[in-house]
Amino acid sequence: MFSNFYVQQRIKKMELMRQEGFNPYANKTTRTISNYNFLNKYNHLKMQSSDDTQDCTQNKEIESIVGRVRFIRLMGKACFIKIQDESGILQAYVSKNDIGEDFLLIKKVLEVGDIINVSGYAFVTKTGELSIHTLTLQILTKSIVPLPEKFHGLNDIELRYRQRYVDLIVNNKVKETFKLRSQIVSCIRQFFEQKGFLEVETPMLHSIPGGANARPFITHHNALDVDRYLRIAPELYLKRLIVGGFEAIFELNRNFRNEGMDHSHNPEFSMIEFYWAYKTYEDLITLTQELFAFLFKKLNLPHSLIHDELEIDFSQWHIIGYKEALIKIGGLDKNIIDNQDALLSFLMSKHLKVDKSMSYGKLLGEAFDEFVEHKLINPTFITQYPIEISPLARRNDENPNVADRFELFIGGKEIANGFSELNDPIDQFERFKEQAKAKDAGDEEAQYMDEDYVWALAHGMPPTAGEGIGIDRLVMLLSNAKTIKDVILFPALKPTKSNFDIILSQDALSNAQIIKEN
């Protein structure tokens, strides 16, 4: 693991530190200020004299910073070091005249990637750069693996995901994306709390998977000697809480689906689901628009965003029915979509994976996915979903073949799914039976029968509307990320050879970032 030549060279320097009485993994620091705050606090000095050769210690406030070394420029008895902490990069000037004989050891052992603690005072160099004039320097952590040079040594996309810790060090844009993600999640919580919703937590391990049409992960509970399923959605437990008397609840957590991976799907993903008693799906459409307006205001985002080279106008929101979208947006003939046999023949002629066993609603769903979804660029609510593909949604009073349901599409991707909840226990029981038949016929994504949930409904659930929003896709949208892996810190990846072998096989190493001048 540590046999690489460059690693061995660094280990020797670490051992030299120990021989000289220095701990290469020191614990205590004297940090007083972040790099960002240092630059802000002393920015006024840039307007004053920048002569760094004079003795400026008198009446100077001593500050202490910490961070990772990103660049070293050696100049005989002095050097300049770029130090990076979470807030930014600050330059330190280090001279033998200030730190004495320690300078010689530091010159021998300090390398790019090491984490250091520098104490000194603010000054401006002759080139006009605000810096810290070092009085003491301590190596806090010796890095024994070289960093890639800028990003040239870590240009393999998969490697960036596997070694996210390196990606975060060398690519500030990646760090900013995840800071934005944190802000988005925080704003979402603020929004629902201000609306009077209560945040709750429901089980991650389910005895019966439910709440979505998806294939679950299966594990085994040794103490109980029973199989358990990682949850594919929290929906059925959240609606049990509505039965119990809570009227406005949300859960922001992880879901797991044992399915394929692509640019917009990860088997482990984050969602917020929220349920609102005595409301309808129309109320949720309004609430969703209010949520986006809240996010855009809090995050100071423009109403027009670029995502995946598409310009999205958030000032215009559209609502259109399912079949109407197939005709007007998908370009399908009304006579075809109104006839199950004609629709099946048409989809087969387009070489889609359909067959006679599929329900009419399932065929409509296949047509929608193929001909409509990718064309929904500006925010669009699709309503009046086929009842066959909406097993947990309430039937529409005027047309029992469709559900009181919507999905929100932005940038050609599904962002949210909401509906007026089915609260008729007998109807729900019959739909579960239909789902069970579909599963027996080979539909691995069909839902399981959950009699306890039906029994909960039998106690009476008030009219309720519920919705789920994918956090990862939302962050992709607002950060202009091209793949879901760019917004998940540690995404699921295919197994590969040892990470250590991969990273150390790179030739462009950080040693090139140490510049020596006579």
UniProtKB/Swiss-Prot annotation:
Residues bound to Mg(2+) 2: 414
Keyword Flavoprotein part of the UniProt annotation: no
Enzyme class: ligase
Intracellular or extracellular location(s): Cytoplasm
Cross-referenced HAMAP family: Lys_tRNA_synth_class2
Taxonomic superkingdom: Bacteria
Amino-acid positions noted as binding Mg(2+) 1 in the UniProt annotation, renumbered to this chain: 407, 414
Keywords: Aminoacyl-tRNA synthetase, ATP-binding, Cytoplasm, Ligase, Magnesium, Metal-binding, Nucleotide-binding, Protein biosynthesis
UniProt-recorded name of the protein: Lysine--tRNA ligase
EC number(s) on file: 6.1.1.6
CDD domains xrefs: LysRS_core (cd00775), LysRS_N (cd04322)
GO annotation terms (biological process): lysyl-tRNA aminoacylation
